[in-house]
Amino acid sequence: MTTILKHLPVGQRIGIAFSGGLDTSAALLWMRQKGAVPYAYTANLGQPDEDDYDEIPRRAMEYGAENARLIDCRKQLVAEGIAAIQCGAFHNTTAGVTYFNTTPLGRAVTGTMLVAAMKEDGVNIWGDGSTYKGNDIERFYRYGLLTNAELKIYKPWLDTDFIDELGGRQEMSEFMSQAGFGYKMSAEKAYSTDSNILGATHEAKDLEFLNSSVKIVNPIMGVKFWDENVKVPAEEVTIRFERGHPVALNGKTFTDDIELMLEANRIGGRHGLGMSDQIENRIIEAKSRGIYEAPGMALLHIAYERLLTGIHNEDTIEQYHANGRQLGRFLYQGRWFDSQALMLRDSSQRWIASAITGEVTLELRRGNDYSIMNTVSDNLTYKPERLTMEKGDSVFSPDDRIGQLTMRNLDITDTREKLFNYAETGLLSSSASTGLPQVGQLQDKTEK
């Protein structure tokens, strides 16, 4: 039997990821009217633009849901966000400005926790609002089936009957009004927004055009730092980690990770920290563009990597970055819980994050403009006395360095011979216009 149902399974229970917006409201009502038995599941992800979560299940019941549940996903989402920071699981960057994979993290948590709740209710068919051109349709597909092997997928937006009747937002609004709910469309924005406690994604519509800049976006987690009329005074903030876990901000210790992330968002948001404009490759290899906010994630990430560079050696840091980029891709593709991702994640958390204990002080200014003011840790391998230029006791002498340099003669000789070989085969030019060594000429002189 096929996993994806193209038409409404009449008479059967269908779980719908219900946001309370026009799309899912119309879909739920339509499914009930057509004879299905819809169950509504709403994820509380700590969305900064959601005012009343309790109202959402009540509306679902009004629209015909057999049952409606609100699932608090915030604790798990923050835990996954901190894990991503510990592993550096971020692969999309532009000129050093990072996208913190906040939407993929949200999908990993939503896709597993909502389907687990559905399974408890005996609901084995799942629908959500993802479209066939995006990443989420595959992410939810993977996470849903990982959680419930018996799961079937029904998406109204892939059902031609639904599309023919309610193919646009205007038709959906009229459908709701005719049913007596008087649903009014919200004011149309120049882009769409998806958010959770870790960050916000702004994309589509006007933002599909690269000549539309960040300036058309109204941030929901921070300030318009690019607007000269917005006052953004500099601010010092101290972040403390213990064994890779953020525990304190500005001297205040948090026992609740949700509250810590909210406070990190408030601090970073006051400066517009963590906002980025990215061109990325979707799972299907087509490029898309998004503008992202993640003030708390950015704040914690900066402090974490500052401690990382002061504590671990070069090879470990290099492996952290390489594994982090690969893990970020797995996360983006909906493979956060696949074995290849768990392997990378476990190694970074076990051998890298466990040593990250200390405190970093930053001065935040506008946007991603900041300075590192101080770094303190008992685990630092940074020892200024080892390389001081001042006179005094040293851990090694000039004679030690002469010996070390002499040992380099071995690989320098090997490299010179390779360069001669490259010149002989024409791979290296002896032209004066190149920046390469004139090895051909050097070889001639050596032979003479």
Curated annotation (Swiss-Prot):
Q: What is its main location?
A: cytoplasm
User: Record-annotated residues binding L-aspartate?
Assistant: 131, 135-136
Write out the residues that bind ATP. 17-25, 43, 129, 131, 136, 194
Q: Which residues form the signal peptide?
A: none
Instruction: Print the keywords alphabetically.
Output: Amino-acid biosynthesis, Arginine biosynthesis, ATP-binding, Cytoplasm, Ligase, Nucleotide-binding
Q: Name one GO molecular function term.
A: protein homodimerization activity
> Does Aminoacyl-tRNA synthetase count among this protein's keywords?
no
Q: Which InterPro entries does the UniProt record give?
A: Arg_succ_synth_type2_subfam, Arginosuc_syn_C, Arginosuc_syn_N, Arginosuc_synth, Arginosuc_synth_CS, Arginosuc_synth_type_1_subfam, AS_cat/multimer_dom_body, AS_multimer_C_tail
Q: Which reaction does it catalyse?
A: L-citrulline + L-aspartate + ATP = 2-(N(omega)-L-arginino)succinate + AMP + diphosphate + H(+)
Tell me any Pfam family this protein matches: Arginosuc_synth
Q: What class of enzyme is it?
A: ligase
GO biological process: any one? urea cycle
Q: What is its EC number?
A: 6.3.4.5
Query: At which positions is L-citrulline bound?
Result: 99, 135, 139, 192, 201, 203, 280
The entry's cellular-component GO terms read: cytoplasm
**Pathway named in the protein's UniProt entry:** Amino-acid biosynthesis; L-arginine biosynthesis; L-arginine from L-ornithine and carbamoyl phosphate: step 2/3
Organism superkingdom: Bacteria
Which PANTHER family does UniProt cross-reference here? ARGININOSUCCINATE SYNTHASE (PTHR11587:SF2)
Name it: Argininosuccinate synthase
Gene for this chain: argG
